[in-house]
Amino acid sequence: LGVVSSKDVIKMNFNNKKQSADLNYPIDSLKYEVHSNPKNVVLIAIDSWNYRAFNQDITPHISHFADSCSRFTSHLSSSNGTRGSIFGLFFSLSSIYWTDFEVSGIQPLLIEELLKQNYQIGIYPSATIVNPPFAKILFSKVPDLRTHTEGKTVYDRDCRITADYLQALDTLGSGTKPFFSFLFYDLAHGYEVPKDKLYRFQPSWEFADYMKLNNDIDPTPFLNLYYNCVAEADS
C-alpha cells in the first residue's frame, strides 16, 4: 500500500520476545578455529533442480566439477519446495520452524558468524527474495542487500547474475576481506528458455502448459523442457 517501504519491511523486527525465548537456536554455541587466512565461500543453488537431472548428459560442467570434489550423498533436504529447502539449507532445521523464525528476527547462525568475522556478503538472486521473504528471514542484517535482478525473462535474469558476479569477482578477489557469495538460479524453476536453447533434448515443449498434463499424456516433451532448462543453467 506504500505505507512501509520494502527495505523497511526486510529490516523490521516484530520484537516477539516470547517467540524468541521459545526458540533455542542454536542449542549449542558454534565452535570453530579462526584462521589468519580465512577461506572465501561461494554457494550456488539451482531452484527446483531434481537429482535425476544431475548427470553427464544434462549437467556436464557440474558433473565434471563434482568429480574432483567432496559429495555429500546422505544429506536430506528439509523440503521439496523452494521456501522450505532454502530455509533448511541456511538454518539446518526443518521448515516447520519457518513462521517462528520469521517473527523472531533470529538470523541463521551461518550469516551471523560470517558478519562477525567481517566477511563481505553478496547475494545474487535471479528471482526476487522479497517473496518468499528470504531477505527478511535469512539476510536482514546483510548490508546493501540485493533483493532482485533486472530482466524481462528468467533466462535474462539468470544470465545477469552470472555476469554481475563475474564482474564483482574482480573486486572481491583483490580485497583484504574474505567474502561469502550466494547465487540463486531460477531457470529450472521457471521452465522457460529461449527457443534456440531447446535443442539439447527433443521433443520438447516450448513452455510448461500445465493444462495439458494428465495421467495419460506422454511426459517426455514436458520432461525434456525441464532438462533443457537445467542444461542451460549448467552452461
Protein language model regions, located:
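Metal-dependent active-site segment of extracytoplasmic phospho-/sulfohydrolases and closely related
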Residues: 42-43, 225-235
